[in-house]
């Protein structure tokens, strides 16, 4: 099942990038989707992943996950952005590398969560997929700005999407004793993306609808957490 989750996450990258090529980013106010994704990622981090982690032992790993993705974003310049903003990022290949590294780590995190608790794996996967929608759009826009052809962009998105199953496969080599540390690292990743990347992007201009989107994202995970175990 975890490999199915990983494939779905990869497909979300490809579909989001394809929609950007079709002009979706110019027609839809992505702030609401970004805000919803931020709410989901923060809810999963604080309410699902962190309760599985011993913070007394793994606080440093949590901080390392946060710092690692801060450095990755600043070096690779990968972040949710609008079409006009991405026109200044002439770094197509670097964008693909950054997204691929992020995908690999997310794939491993999804698998580790699944190994600890299949429902936790589902929640992490949900957060990853929703995050990949703005990320896939961003990567596509960056590559368009770098004058890549649509075919080349789709191939790049497809290859980077394969890093999810590859990351999931590597989770099988992580000893059980390190599963909590892996989750702490993923929590740091999610908290950084949700709080330092997605939320600021969603709130470029004050808008109560964006705030509602964030709250809705967190509420959605609460509803999912309540109903899915009953099925």
Predicted regions and their residues:
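Intrinsically disordered, metal-sensing/regulatory segments
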Residues: 1-231
């Amino acid at each position: 099942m975890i490999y199915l989750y990983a494939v779905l996450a990869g497909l979300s990258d490809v579909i989001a990038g394809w929609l950007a090529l079709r002009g979706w980013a110019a027609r839809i106010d992505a702030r609401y989707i970004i805000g919803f994704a931020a709410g989901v990622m923060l809810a999963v981090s604080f309410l699902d992943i962190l309760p599985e982690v011993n913070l007394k032992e793994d606080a440093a790993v949590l901080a390392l996950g946060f710092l690692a993705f801060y450095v990755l974003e600043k070096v690779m310049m990968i972040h949710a952005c609008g079409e006009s903003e991405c026109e200044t990022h002439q770094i197509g290949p670097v964008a693909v590398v950054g997204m691929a590294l992020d995908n690999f780590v997310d794939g491993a995190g999804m698998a580790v969560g699944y190994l600890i608790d299949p429902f936790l794996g589902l929640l992490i996967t949900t957060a990853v997929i929703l995050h990949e929608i703005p990320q896939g759009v961003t990567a596509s826009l960056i590559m368009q700005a770098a004058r890549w052809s649509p075919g080349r962009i789709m191939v790049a998105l497809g290859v980077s999407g394969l890093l999810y199953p590859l990351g999931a496969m590597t989770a099988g080599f992580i000893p059980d004793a390190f599963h909590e540390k892996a989750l702490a690292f993923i929590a740091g990743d999610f908290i950084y993306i949700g709080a330092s990347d997605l939320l600021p992007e969603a709130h470029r201009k004050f808008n109560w609808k964006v705030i509602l989107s964030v709250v809705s994202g967190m509420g959605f995970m609460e509803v999912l957490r309540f109903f899915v175990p009953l099925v």
